[in-house]
Amino acid sequence: MREIVHLQTGQCGNQIGAAFWQTIAGEHGLDGSGHYTGSSDLQLERMNVYFNEASSKKYVPRAVLVDLEPAALDAVRAGPFGQLFRPDNVVFGQSGAGNNWAKGHYTEGANLVDQVIDVVRREAEGCDCLQGFQITHSLGGGTGAGMGTLLISKIREEFPAGMMATFSVVPSPMVSDTVVEPYNATLSIHQLVEHSDETFCIDNEALYNICMRTLKLTNPSYGDLNHLVSAVMSGVSTSLRFPGQLNSDLRKLAVNMVPFPRLHFFMVGFAPLTSRNAYSFRAVSVPELTQQMFDPKNMMAATDFRSGRYLTCSAIFRGKVSMKEVEDQMRNIQNKNSAYFVEWIPNNVQTALCSIPPRGLQMSSTFVGNSTSIQELFKRVGDQFTAMFRKKAFLFWYTGEGMDEMEFTEAENNMNDLVSEYQQYQDASVSDGEEEYLEDEQLEGEE
């Protein structure tokens, strides 16, 4: 079987991770202690992608929980599914990273990282055929961003063939915890461009907007935001966990979604959107799901895809859905919005079906898009970074941990390059390719 080892680092990563495990344990028919109480063989068929079967029919998540202070991990273990995790897989320090990327990446985190890699190695050795890793973390803090990216690069060295997927929460100006978020995020993106294979960008601002506008929650809690994120994570991993018509593993997803290796930052969306307490009482149809899924208001990254173009996208439908209806609807959307899809990548929209819907819903759809409009998100962080870096504000927090200003400049340049690469492919057209091809032909002819 194609197993995935899951890591969650920092407070944000652990809270999202806990919500994810709660969601998929429910979908696979597991109770809070990991015993199977479900009714369908389909739930068991690919259970061991994410779970190890221990003695006495107990299933244990292949998860490694990491933090530089014990508080968030204690909260996870005291939660409803806290008994699920293997106690040896919980690794924590005492000092915390104090929202400082350098502490997570170079000092405090570096002291703890070998211990974490030992746990990861043990989990990987328990797999028959490891397909890769997924990590949940935020890019604005110290542990998730600094230590999270350190772990990614260490795992890359140790398991070069494994895929690396990250669920990364990008800081947003509306929902800001600390003043140095732009530094932490830019330094992290610099790492992710090089070391990650696929990064699902989640944005607190977009999540807040969804909660306020669509779900009509007056003051959303982090629990509500995490509920949305876990719905998307569960949707993205559906085709890995259940048998379906288009069984993508992490590598197939990357092959279908990433046309150029550096451009692996995805926008995600989910439909139908429901709040935690009110599962939808009306039946949804495939046209409605498709419409909602492509709606900019449903995207969990605060960018508008209408300001860019899709290089590739993938939709995962769950529930009793007919393949033909889905294909028709997806074709319909493409025809109506053809300006928003690049024409030089043929068949750039994939659809996958899975017959098991999420809990409490008749059917649902999850959307993953590789759109050039994601550059808005990097620009936003980059502008804030530049404004602070020009004045060298708060730099001493980082240089004090042994970092050099040069690293900041490199990270800034790398992010600017990423933005201009997205822009280049947004502007590219079929004729550009043909002209280059003709020029090459002429040159060959002249030779």
UniProtKB/Swiss-Prot annotation:
Cofactor(s) listed in the protein's UniProt record: Mg(2+)
Binding residue positions for Mg(2+): 69
Taxonomic placement: Eukaryota, Fungi, Dikarya, Ascomycota, Pezizomycotina
Keywords recorded for this protein, A-Z: Cytoplasm, Cytoskeleton, GTP-binding, Magnesium, Metal-binding, Microtubule, Nucleotide-binding
InterPro entries registered for this protein in UniProt: Beta-tubulin_BS (IPR013838), Beta_tubulin (IPR002453), Tub_FtsZ_C (IPR008280), Tubulin (IPR000217), Tubulin/FtsZ-like_C (IPR037103), Tubulin/FtsZ_2-layer-sand-dom (IPR018316), Tubulin/FtsZ_GTPase_sf (IPR036525), Tubulin_C (IPR023123)
Transmembrane intervals: none
Subunit structure, as described in the record: Dimer of alpha and beta chains. A typical microtubule is a hollow water-filled tube with an outer diameter of 25 nm and an inner diameter of 15 nM. Alpha-beta heterodimers associate head-to-tail to form protofilaments running lengthwise along the microtubule wall with the beta-tubulin subunit facing the microtubule plus end conferring a structural polarity. Microtubules usually have 13 protofilaments but different protofilament numbers can be found in some organisms and specialized cells.
Annotated PROSITE patterns: TUBULIN, TUBULIN_B_AUTOREG
Main localization of the protein described in the UniProt heading: cytoplasm
GO CC field: cytoplasm; microtubule
Binding site for GTP: 11, 69, 138, 142-144, 204, 226
Family per record: Belongs to the tubulin family.
Protein's name according to its UniProt entry: Tubulin beta chain
